[in-house]
Amino acid sequence: MTEHPLTLNTPDGHTIAGRQYLPAQPVAILVISHGMAEHGDRYQELARWLGAHNILVITYHHRGHGPHCPAEHQGHYADQNGWQRVVDDLAQVVETARKQHPGLPVNLLGHSMGSFIAQSYAQQYGDRINALILSATNRIHRPQLLASRLLVNLIAGVRGRRHRSRLIGKMTFGQFNRAFRPNRTGSDWLSRDPEQVDRYEADPCCGFDCSVGLWQDFIAGMLSIRPATWHRDLPVHLLSGTADAVGEMGKGVRQHFQTIRESGIEQVTLRLFDGGRHEMLNETNRMEVWQYVLTLCRIQSPARSEARNLPLAQSLP
């Protein structure tokens, strides 16, 4: 297997940085959309393991994330239209994979925040992928999101979109961690594996406060997700842990699974791992989870084995 850097220039002048893990005889592609306040390189071990099993993996960093992101832009998508920009970035990554490796089925895995980016992508570009895998996602809780939007908009009105609010961080990540008191670190909610938690805590590209603007974009993006508008023949697979605070300890993930199924999607699956916290891919039983992801990547839908020549939406200026 070989590894190559990925560098793509977007129409609005942004540079997408990532990495490709290319086995000698790939049978499928997996594009990974990472979560908030982390980066694509955290999936390197998974990517290498999947590569050893003939899955071509592409990881990349969202805007405002990753080691190449300037400090002044960390945790911030864009001053305008941030959500659509990150969705279009993902579309560009997928199209690059399609063009470089024609004929291979493309699976999209989105984790946490990245799972919602992936859902927005599927809503707009669903015919471009063969399967959607959602890791550590949650239901679209509209009343809660609308209340959060009021608070975030108030802070933005006073402090500006680029302000990094510790209050929002405490109300989200801090709340998640309180479920695991007494806490050893501020990130115990991520995994039962203390080594994985310590690696996250020590990583300067992880755990930072995001801008109020990113939170505005994120909330608006989540509110725009409507599974009833997705392509019905797109397979959707949800995986989470029963102790994932983001997924409401399994409750929210189950509800989202039910919503997607009732929306008419023909193939929807849910896998809950007992006792697992937010990052199932970094959990104590991660090899079991990796094997499950490998199994999903090897499932090919003949109706989606080739990319369809659909026009892509124009990227925002």
Give the label of every model feature segment.
Residues 1-22:
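N-terminal cap/lid segment of alpha/beta-hydrolase-fold proteins
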Residues 27, 34-38, 112, 242-243:
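Active-site glycine-rich loops that stabilize anionic/oxyanionic intermediates
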Residues 45-73:
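Conserved alpha/beta-hydrolase
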Residues 78-98:
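Alpha/beta-hydrolase active-site loop
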Residues 101-112:
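Alpha/beta-hydrolase fold nucleophile elbow
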Residues 118-205:
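Alpha/beta-hydrolase-fold enzymes
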Residues 238-240:
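Short beta-strand/loop motif that positions the catalytic acidic residue
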Residues 263-317:
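Catalytic active-site module of serine/aspartate enzymes centered on a nucleophile-bearing elbow/loop
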